[in-house]
């Protein structure tokens, strides 16, 4: 469900209930093997800009699977899917630097470009704030920490907020530009490749 209506009531420690409404998102991981064994890293994002809704991901497989990449992309306008063919997606990153807390390479900009004949959409996520750095080993305790260190567990999860811009081109003519805030993540199971 890329976008649904959310109605939430929260009461903390028996206090007065607080009521909130907004948009909600739900996804589900599926498969019969651990993602840790299959995936090296991925960028994942969702966003809403005016009448557009976006879900985008770029997955890199582990080295034993050839480090192959898999884009996932869906762009809808007014609830109707207008772009969802992964073979038409080009993914790129700008200003990649090592994030000091996790040691993972993080892009300042993540760009998904969707080209379908004369139609082209460019969606650019520009990182403004890191809202979460989670090193997986820090969630472990006791003997599990020792085992994780022996196995060289090095995974991290990072979440960012910033601006999402959408540019729509027809035959190389810019016909529409939209901007809004967005949330996206980098899940980095694997080790950073040293050059």
Label each residue range with its predicted role.
Residues 1-195:
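Structured soluble/peripheral alpha/beta segments that form catalytic or ligand/cofactor-binding pockets
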């Amino acid at each position: 469900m890329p976008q649904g209506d959310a109605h939430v009531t929260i009461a903390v420690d028996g206090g007065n209930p607080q009521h909130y409404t907004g948009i909600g998102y739900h996804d589900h991981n599926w498969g019969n093997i651990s993602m840790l064994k299959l995936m090296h890293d991925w960028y994942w994002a969702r966003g809403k800009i005016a009448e557009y809704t976006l879900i985008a991901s770029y997955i890199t497989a582990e080295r034993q699977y050839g480090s192959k990449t898999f884009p996932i992309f869906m762009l809808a306008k007014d609830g109707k899917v207008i772009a969802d063919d992964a073979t038409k997606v080009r993914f790129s990153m700008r200003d990649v630097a090592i994030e000091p807390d996790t040691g993972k390479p993080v892009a300042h900009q993540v760009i998904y470009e969707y080209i379908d004949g004369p139609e082209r959409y460019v969606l650019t996520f520009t990182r403004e704030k890191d809202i979460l750095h989670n090193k997986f080993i820090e969630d472990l305790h006791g003997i599990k920490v020792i085992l994780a260190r022996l196995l060289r567990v090095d995974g991290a999860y990072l979440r960012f907020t910033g601006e999402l811009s959408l540019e729509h081109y027809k035959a190389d003519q810019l016909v529409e530009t939209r901007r809004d805030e967005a949330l996206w993540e980098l899940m980095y199971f694997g080790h950073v490749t040293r050059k």
